[in-house]
Every structure is written in C-alpha cells, then in structure tokens.
Design a protein with these regions (language model features):
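Active-site/pore-lining binding-face segments in mid-to-C-terminal subdomains
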Residues: 308-311, 315-333
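Vicinal oxygen chelate
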Residues: 1-39, 43-49, 63-119, 123-232, ...
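Extended accessory and catalytic-adjacent subdomains in large enzymes
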Residues: 57, 98, 237, 270, ...
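Beta-propeller domains
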Residues: 225-287
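Conserved active-site tyrosine of GNAT-family acetyltransferases
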Residues: 57-62, 141, 241-248, 331
Length: 333
C-alpha cells in the first residue's frame, strides 16, 4: 500500500504549482467522501466497433492475446460481447451497433475530426471500476461536478443501468469512467437478459484465429493489459490527470519527457494491486508545446497531430508479454 500523503512522483517532467497544489487536495477529498473505500480495481474496459466489425475484432484479439469471448447479449441498440483472459484481470466488453445507421455521441465526436470520420462509430469508450454501490459513487462525485449519464441522456442505454453507471465523456480525454456494483461476468444482472449466439462461420473464424496464435508459438506469451494511453492536447495534460484521479482510486506515479517526440508520458496507477495487470495503469500522453508554437523551432509534434486529426482519444492498449526464447529468438530484449 502506498501512502499518498508522502509519495513523491517519479520522472523528469515538471508540473505546475497549480498541479502540485491540487493533487494532494484531490487525494484528501477522495478519502473524505469515501471514494477510495467504495471503488476498487478496474473491472472492464469498453470498446465500441462499427456495425459488422465485432467478429473480425474478436478474431484479431484471439490472434494477438489472451482475450476470448465468454458471453454475448443484445440490448436495444447493440450486440454486447464479454471477453475474458485471467480471472483476476479486467474483462473486455465490445459493443457493436445493430444498425449501420446508428448514431450517438461517439458518432458526432468522430465526425468532428478529419481522420476519425472514416469509422465514426469506432472508439475506445473507457474503463469500468468495481464498486460497492453505483448510487453512492454518483452521490460522492456529482457535488464535484462529475457528470453522470441518466435515462434519456444517451442513445445507448448501456451507459445508464441500475447496477452500471458511466460518466459523460470527459472534456479533456473524450473517454468515460464507469462503475459496476455486481459481478461484471453476470451480464444478466446488468439487465442484458437476451442471449444470442454467433453463426457457425463466425465462431469458426474466431477459433481459427486462436489456433493461429498457437501455431505461431505465441500462445501464453501475451499476458494481460499493462496500460492504456490516451492522447490529449498539450495544454490539458494536468487537467486530464487531476480529473481522472478525482474519479478513481489511482495515484500519479510520475511523468517523463520524451525529448525526441517533444512530449511527455504521464502515468497513473492503482496503489494496492500487486500486479498492474489486475488494474492496468492509465497513461496520458501530451505534447510539451501546442501546435501553433512548434513551428518556431520546428519541433516534433506527433501527439498534437494525432489529437488534431483524430480528436482526444485512446491511442493504444498495451499488453504485458512473457520474456523467453521462441524459435531461437529472444522474445523481449
């Protein structure tokens, strides 16, 4: 257990006086309202794919890592797939709109940016954390100006259920945070009671992908999720971190400059898990200078370019890998 009152963050990235003032205050308020007691580890990560893409995506996951589908349900607007790896690791929930014409907040945000318009319904949604009571979490966070989805607010009712609640999309990251107070493996307890099965051809496609992983000798080498990294604008780095730490029981582990990219990597982690794969780190990456300043010195700005082209959003999900030798080649250097 890390003592957040005395912990000194790591790294060479300097933070502002504003950040240094409010970080301990965020920690203190979490304790005062009971958030650190009522919210636990990450239970799931949620991704929406375009209509018709879920099977191909799950096949891709079956080749690349340990996640396999264990349940599939229907909501009024989506097919909902539950994927598991190890019992102690977060689940992966894949949402697929039932209609190619489906439109919601994700569609509208994606259409604002030039390179995300090609797949307007594809987006990383956010993380779901286990809690003792979703109602208690709302009661604790709403006075802090954290906005939650209520019935009728969104086209997709997955974001507002009796035992599952989500925040609105963050103004800084365009991600959500969700909370669940029942077993995440029990989709029926979430009100998703209508089961469906994939066609034999779709099941065969996913099975063949899993077999390919074994044939190539990489099964067992890719472990659970290590971290997920959101790219944000240069001027919103500290705000995004403080907002996230307001909503979840994580801590600011540290931040490092990446001089070659003119950016920084900022890491938040869960203070009590003995393995990050049980509650993966949440990383925020931002340029050190905004786009309109970079041209003075022709500085690199891949992170800023990404955000300007795709919007604030998740950039990658990184899996931990097992060290070892395969086919005479070392797997990890």
């Amino acid at each position: 257990m890390i003592d957040l009152s005395t912990y000194q963050s790591l790294g060479d990235k300097k933070n502002s006086d504003f950040f240094q003032e409010f970080l301990p205050r965020v920690y203190e308020r979490r304790v005062a309202v009971g958030l650190d007691e009522m919210v636990g580890a990450m239970a799931a990560v949620v991704i929406q794919v375009a209509h018709g893409d879920a099977v191909n995506y799950m096949a891709e996951l079956a080749v690349m890592g340990p996640y396999r589908m264990t349940d599939s349900r229907l909501s009024e607007t989506h097919r909902v797939f539950l994927l598991c790896s190890e019992p102690d690791f977060p689940r992966l929930i894949v949402l697929e709109p039932l209609s190619p014409a489906y439109t919601d907040e994700i569609t509208r945000w994606n259409n604002l940016y030039p390179l995300s318009r090609a797949n307007p319904n594809a987006r990383y949604i956010g993380e779901v954390y286990s809690t003792k009571s979703v109602a208690a979490v709302r009661d604790a966070l709403e006075p802090q100006n954290i906005r939650f989805v209520y019935p009728g607010d969104q086209e997709n009712d997955f974001f507002c259920r009796e035992h599952l609640t989500f925040t609105f999309m963050s103004d800084f990251t365009y991600n959500r945070v969700g909370y669940v107070d029942v077993d995440i493996d029990d989709l029926g307890a979430l009100g998703l009671t209508e089961r469906f099965t994939l066609s034999p051809d779709d099941e065969a496609k996913i099975s063949r992908a899993a077999e390919l992983q074994a044939e190539r000798g990489i099964d067992g080498l890719v472990l659970g999720l290590d971290h997920m990294a959101t790219r944000i604008l240069a001027g919103e780095r500290e705000d995004a971190i403080l907002e996230y730490l307001t909503m979840v029981p994580y801590y600011f582990w540290g931040a490092y400059n990446i001089s070659e990219m003119n950016s920084s990597t900022n890491v938040t982690r869960h203070p009590t898990v003995d393995d990050d794969k049980k509650s993966p780190a949440r990383v925020f990456t931002a340029n050190n200078t905004p786009s309109f300043v970079n041209s003075f010195d022709n500085l690199p700005m891949p992170t800023e370019d990404f955000v300007r082209n795709f919007g604030r959003r998740m950039h990658h999900m990184a899996f931990a890998v097992q060290d070892g030798h395969v086919a005479t080649e070392k797997n990890v250097d």
